[in-house]
Amino acid sequence: MSVLVQFRVKVPDVERFRAAAAKFEPVIAGLGGSNHRAFVSESDPNEVATLSEWDSHDAMMAATDRFGDDFNREAGTEGLEWETRIWHEL
């Protein structure tokens, strides 16, 4: 059964994050992620989140091991504290 993965982080540059999220969308899709979208918080203009579906938590971990460092460099999120939540359909 697939999982919905939520990543959340406060960023110094939302536009830079948005550009990286768009650039890496095909990479994520190529590694098995689907419905990848990025969002900004209504209550905090520097808080962003991404949501994407994966076949499993392990599949997401294997994929992010391959592109995560490059994404963080592009997005300006190196060294920032990310919150990760894995959601299972009821």
Can you describe what each PLM-predicted range is?
Residues 3, 29-49, 69-90:
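Glycine-rich beta-strand-turn "strand-cap" elements at beta-sheet edges
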Residues 7, 50-52:
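Conserved RNP beta-strands of RNA recognition motif
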Residues 9-12, 55:
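Structured loop/turn residues at secondary-structure junctions
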Residues 17-20, 55-66:
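Short amphipathic alpha-helices within nucleic acid-binding modules
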